[in-house]
Amino acid sequence: MEVMVKKKLIIIGAGGFSKSIIGSINFDEVDMVGFIDTYKKGFHQGYPILSNSIDNIDKKNDYFYFIGIGEPKIRWGFYRVLLESKLEMINIIDSSAIISKCTTLGKGIYIGKMCIVNSDTKISDAAVINTRALIEHGNVIGCCSNISTNTVLNGDVQVGSRTFVGSCSVVNGQLTIGCDSIIGSGSVVIRNVPDNVVVAGSPTRFIRENNND
């Protein structure tokens, strides 16, 4: 009988979002090693904080990595580091999530508790689909974007890279949300949203530009 070798996992970031990640890990397949965190020391959720930098991890190619930070632009920075260092990323998908077999998944993705992802959807690298989000058919979720809790994306929505869609928002079908934008919590999106803006409300209205790096 073949024995499955568990993937040794290091999570980048020891904040609140990482607690949800720990709760969704399949420990039959993953051996949680510890965290990397720029500021914290000691332990987090019972696991050691190993270092403040990937560069300080001994034999770093022996591990899989997951970005445990929800903010899209910070995720993007660590995603680029992992790519450039040729380090392996792992998907963490909660066992309660319902995902169509016709979904295309990248790497480094989080899909949280009670999420639904319907057919012909593409979720790009390092994206976050958070608790109870509903992603309908034909969606495209950009790299490092974060679809927050209880959000509904109706059919054929496209979300650009590094965009945050706040909790309990509803996005009408066939709309495009640009890159590097923020949709405020509880918003109702009835028209396309361009790149680099903050919008909020029901229906959404322009709040400000989002040009901060």
Residue ranges and their predicted role:
Residues M1-N52, I57-D58:
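Hydrophobic, well-ordered beta-alpha structural blocks that scaffold small-molecule cofactor pockets
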Residues G13, Y65, M89, E136-H137:
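Generic structural signal for conserved hydrophobic packing positions in ordered secondary structure
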Residues G16-F17, K73-I74, T104, F206:
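Short alpha-helical
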Residues I22-S24, G77-V81, I123, P194-D195, ...:
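Short amphipathic alpha-helical segments
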Residues V33, Y63-F64, K107, S161:
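Conserved acidic residues
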Residues K40-I98:
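Phosphate-bearing ligand-interacting subdomains
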Residues Q45-Y47, C102-T103, E209-N211:
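Short, well-ordered secondary-structure micro-motifs
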Residues N91-A200, T204-I207:
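Structural signal for interior beta-strand "rungs" in well-ordered beta-sheet cores
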